[in-house]
Amino acid sequence: MQLTQLLALALSLATSEAAYKGFNYGDKKPDGSSKYQADFASEFETAQNLVGAPGFTSARLYTMIQAGTANDPISAIPAAIAQNTSLLLGLWASGNNMNNELTALKAAISQYGEDLSKLVVGISVGSEDLYRNSVLGQKVNAGVGVDPHVLASYIEEVRSTISGTPLSGAPLGHVDTWNDWVNGSNAAVIDAVDWVGFDGYPYFQNTMANSIDDAKALFNEAVAKTKSAAGNKEVWITETGWPVSGKTENLAVASIPNAKRFWDEVGCPLFDNTNTWWYTLQDAFGASVPNPSFGIVGSTLTTQPLFDLSCSKSNTTSSSAIASPTSTAAAAGGVAGGSTGSASGSSTGTGSSSGSGSNSNTGAASGAVGAADRETSGTSGSANTNGTSGSGSGSNSTSGHGSNVTVPTRPTSVSNVSPSKSSSALFTGAATSMGASPSSVGNVGPSKSSGAASPSSTTMFTGAATSVSAPVVHVVLLALMMVIAA
């Protein structure tokens, strides 16, 4: 075998082993004020340099719109380009705001072109819209959602919009709570996407035994059911986390020790194997502290986290429901951006698990829905606020990005821009983060779902891998040894 062939093989395997890891970022600060480029840059730089956790070089956004404007591109984009942070872009699909989101998307492509395309992992069309559209979401006044067939049409509209542009190969997806993915009435969305975004928070599954002792099993079961419903579509972990402070949800106690344990038992097995965006880096600022608060750095933006983020080899291989290394983003173009991740645990975690979770649950029974209620984002400069969705059971989140939309809050209020979670709901879904304060309710926040969009032939889409697992190194070394032996 020729050297070039061996290296190509090694590179392809390395690409398939790469996984993106990062945090969710809303368009507003915890106090409700708008974020600008310098704010995003500070957050991205902090995430990349967290003590004990190198490689968090990806950012999930909920909207394409800069807070305080009608449809200007969000300033997180130039910040990401400057910081070499990969992006899971999001368009807020609820509240009749898609036209403005598409305008902002087109403007971003025109303005940033290849610099943007090299960093885009995927594009999420909507965030927890199905949850807010569900019987359960309506019961808790989670905010305006979107019918699955309308959402599927939005996904195709985005696919058409990026065709022939530098983002033409970006995989498209949708982010929602796991119980809505297993609801058969939402199958049209699964058919339309390239990947499925999973939001899940055992903390909010307050109709079940949901202590920290139960968290890992609840999470793995939810992932397994989502994977079963998704069929051959990849499942990306777009929101999960455990609060460092706040009220108790049934048996779930918010505390730093419990947040650390959830990170170890759920996060570490994911980080080098599955595209994962944690909730969250920071959701508190000074006196503005949401209840519950999920931020791992507390109320001051610092590289020193509230608990040890290092992952031991043992806890990087402990989760049985973790998906195998992602290939959707790699297929779309791979390892372009900054592969900075550490190769800490190879971990397999195939996560087969059955959990077919037939298609009928709307989520009330299992308490897995409602992430949308925990986050809130204040209003953003313009007339409306966008809300992000959240999937956990908690109901207190809303965030708004400030265009002309209103944002609902989780089981209670869902906002879209920044991930602050206030909980008052009884489900377990995934929280979304868009706005800053956990109190505003709106229905427009941007969400992220990305899929492996059919590679449209005009441009090359390159993603930015953030971590490469140990097997890749072995493959490369083996290839070199074979060359030497030959």
Swiss-Prot record:
Cellular compartments annotated: Cell membrane; Secreted, Cell wall
Major localization listed first in the record, in broad terms: membrane
Glycan-modified residues: 84, 183, 315, 386, 396, 404
Region (Disordered): 330-458
Topology versus the membrane: Lipid-anchor; GPI-anchor
Presence of keyword DNA-binding: no
Documented EC number(s): 3.2.1.39
GO biological process assignments: cell wall organization; polysaccharide catabolic process
Molecular function terms from GO: glucan endo-1,3-beta-D-glucosidase activity
Entry-linked Pfam families: Glyco_hydro_17 (PF00332)
Ranges of compositional bias, category Polar residues: 430-442
Entry comment on modification after translation: The GPI-anchor is attached to the protein in the endoplasmic reticulum and serves to target the protein to the cell surface. There, the glucosamine-inositol phospholipid moiety is cleaved off and the GPI-modified mannoprotein is covalently attached via its lipidless GPI glycan remnant to the 1,6-beta-glucan of the outer cell wall layer.
Signal sequence annotation: 1-18
GO cellular component, one term: cell surface
Matches recorded under SUPFAM superfamilies: (Trans)glycosidases
Record keywords: Carbohydrate metabolism, Cell membrane, Cell wall, Cell wall biogenesis/degradation, Glycoprotein, GPI-anchor, Hydrolase, Lipoprotein, Membrane, Polysaccharide degradation, Secreted, Signal
Reported function: Glucanases play a role in cell expansion during growth, in cell-cell fusion during mating, and in spore release during sporulation. This enzyme may be involved in beta-glucan degradation and also function biosynthetically as a transglycosylase.
Name of the protein in its database record: Probable glucan endo-1,3-beta-glucosidase eglC
Native source organism of the sequence: Aspergillus terreus (strain NIH 2624 / FGSC A1156)
Organism classification: Eukaryota, Fungi, Dikarya, Ascomycota, Pezizomycotina
